[in-house]
Amino acid sequence: MSDNDTIVAQATPPGRGGVGILRISGFKAREVAETVLGKLPKPRYADYLPFKDADGSVLDQGIALWFPGPNSFTGEDVLELQGHGGPVILDLLLKRILTIPGLRIARPGEFSERAFLNDKLDLAQAEAIADLIDASSEQAARSALNSLQGAFSARVNHLVEALTHLRIYVEAAIDFPDEEIDFLSDGKIEAQLNDVIADLDAVRAEARQGSLLREGMKVVIAGRPNAGKSSLLNALAGREAAIVTDIAGTTRDVLREHIHIDGMPLHIIDTAGLREASDEVERIGIERAWQEIEQADRVLFMVDGTTTDAVDPAEIWPEFIARLPAKLPITVVRNKADITGETLGMSEVNGHALIRLSAKTGEGVDVLRNHLKQSMGFDTNMEGGFLARRRHLQALEQAAEHLQQGKAQLLGAWAGELLAEELRLAQQNLSEITGEFTSDDLLGRIFSSFCIGK
């Protein structure tokens, strides 16, 4: 297998459909056109032609599109054959194309990878293609499209350019120490560095919003049996996702629901009631519940308001609180307010949010929705926002750390050489986002998660 091979793959989802598309990219795409179509179509024009087998019989007929490189998605010669979407027809056409020497099936994401390697896209834009396909809401799709059009990359490139100018200034100060003006201590470098840090902080804030929009928040509902966990899951989901009975231990496995709150993806997980297991099946369910709790972004500690007047989680169930991960945020949810007559709404107890509601009637559930949105700092007015991945956040955080360390070196010891090194490392972190500086292993992991025909 060679990166110089001509590749082919189905660009439409498998299964039956009105249209099925095969995409070919590479130097032999021209030969495929002449062999299967009998001619080379006019560049960038839709040509209605028969698709022929080796013996001249017609396999299908449809639209052929010819994009000579470098003016194509991949930067190579690209041919698209748009025929009928029957799997048998597409398979016959694919087999016909693969009889031509030098062609092979594309790896997942290989078309996008070639576009990146041929400078048609940077890495953040290439990732945005997969994010656009996987978008689960209108807002996520719009933000992914912004990233694909270069909004995120432009912000990162602006930071890289600013760091380049700053590095030049710092290197000049190091190389010419005998000048009358001490460039390291005259305040100009510090001012420029502060500007870059402020710009980076703004991009980090937007990237966190973009990551929330892409990744969502994982919320686990946990508590004792019959506290109303499944009823709350149903209330948040807006449908009967979980079976609800008065029998303790009805939920024995993990139940998952994916919803949106004003565009923010929310992964709600209902777990088995936590208690001493009565049998092996329940024991496994409780074990899985704890696994989900340990991986959660937030835990909704569900309390049956008819069983206790306490509101402090450490008082209600100290053993449960003691077992939770140290920095895991907790929201105490006192359920069954329709029975206890408690005042609906949100308050605070010992640093934890406390919400009183009725999962059965739905009263107070909107308060919980707003709380979840606010607790993650999600901004519903993300005009012009972009999507971000965890690796992007890590690169931005590392760049910010290097800039802060560089500032400390500048102000503490006027150490120009150390500042210059921190600036270089910050620039390297930012360049990883767009792929200007990255490893082959990282590229392999990113593009292998794409669709075959992308």
Swiss-Prot record:
Residues annotated for (6S)-5-formyl-5,6,7,8-tetrahydrofolate binding in this entry: 23, 80, 120, 454
Residue stretches making up the TrmE-type G domain: 216-377
Keyword Nuclease attached: no
GO cellular component: cytosol
Residue positions binding Mg(2+): 230, 251
Binding site for GTP: 226-231, 245-251, 270-273, 335-338
Gene Ontology biological process: tRNA methylation; tRNA wobble uridine modification
InterPro entries on file: G_TrmE, GTP-bd, GTP-bd_TrmE_N, GTPase_MnmE, MnmE_dom2, MnmE_helical, P-loop_NTPase, Small_GTP-bd
Subunit structure: Homodimer. Heterotetramer of two MnmE and two MnmG subunits.
HAMAP family per the UniProt record, alphabetical: GTPase_MnmE
Family named by the database record: Belongs to the TRAFAC class TrmE-Era-EngA-EngB-Septin-like GTPase superfamily. TrmE GTPase family.
NCBIfam families in alphabetical order: mnmE_trmE_thdF, PRK05291.1-3, small_GTP
Protein role: Exhibits a very high intrinsic GTPase hydrolysis rate. Involved in the addition of a carboxymethylaminomethyl (cmnm) group at the wobble position (U34) of certain tRNAs, forming tRNA-cmnm(5)s(2)U34.
Entry protein name: tRNA modification GTPase MnmE
Native source organism of the sequence: Escherichia coli O157:H7
